[in-house]
Amino acid sequence: VFPFLVDAAQTAGHLPLEPKKWGCTMLAMPGHKGLLGPHGTGALWVADGVMLAPLRQGGTGSASESMFQPRIMPDSLESGTLNLPGIAGLYAGMRFALAHQQEARETTAALCGMMRDALLEMAGVRVYTRADALLLSFNVAGIASQVVASALDEQGIAVRGGLHCAPGVHRFLGTLNIGAVRVSP
């Protein structure tokens, strides 16, 4: 099996996840974004037949007598004491996010659409996002994205300026030196 990891950081909790349909063998997602869990949590879906090497050995609750991790998932990756409060918080957040996913997606799409339309009317503003996206990226000509983000923050509008952990995308867009302003309603 050829390993194929999909990063669902901006997708999980907002759109249905279909890793088998997508042909991926692993799907990683943070808990604190669309899944509404606590910071420091996350999930890794691993397809049947894929075995990952553990980062640490020993201290597993399922084979305490062994110095090595069991060769079964998920036990193979779970050494030490699990973050049970974090897991419970992630579970509660996931339940809420998934129960309201359609409603949230419709509201987010409407907000993004209104903002995109308004930004496209402004002189000197370049919008990088497709019309059907659930987040929005833009720049104001001649003003660094971080400066725009700070100015909006002063008005009580929370956005993020910069490269958003995606230098390849910014290289493609020609914004590697300035980044972009990202709005995630």
Regions found by a protein language model. Give the residues of each.
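Catalytic PLP-binding core of fold-type I/II PLP enzymes
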Residues: V1-M26
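Buried hydrophobic positions in well-ordered alpha/beta secondary-structure cores of metabolic enzymes
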Residues: F4-D7, L27, L44, L90, ...
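Structural signature of PLP-dependent enzymes
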Residues: M73-D117, Y128, D132
